[in-house]
Amino acid sequence: MRHFLNALSFAVVLLPATLCAAQIQGKVIRVLDGDTIEVLQEQQPVRVRLLNIDAPEKKQPFGRWSTNQLKALLAGQSVTVSYTQTDRYGRVLGRVITANGTEANRQQVLKGAAWVYDRYNTDNSLPALQREAQTQK
């Protein structure tokens, strides 16, 4: 019994971060590039970096195209952002879900508008989506 309680205590401490995720709900008021948006929550803009992906900067090849793909998906839309942390720039690192259930992070990869950020990726299904996008190009 003692071992069971120790194991249970250990498991509770190590619960996945997604179970403790916070949420932001609001309207996308700005798309900065292919992996960064601003969401208006309670009259305050919150900068959000799409988790697990990276996209070209606007001035890099395909940067404007990537930005336009994200604009087409999110501009003016109501979204829910699930997150567990912020980055060193104060941006929320999150999964962005539209009102109809589309996850923007995954869509950007599937369209070929962003790639999996291997160094920080925590979504094991994204590499397969990236391979699928590469075979369709």
Model-predicted segments: where are they?
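Small beta-barrel nucleic-acid-binding modules, primarily SNase/OB-fold domains
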Residues: 2-10, 18-137
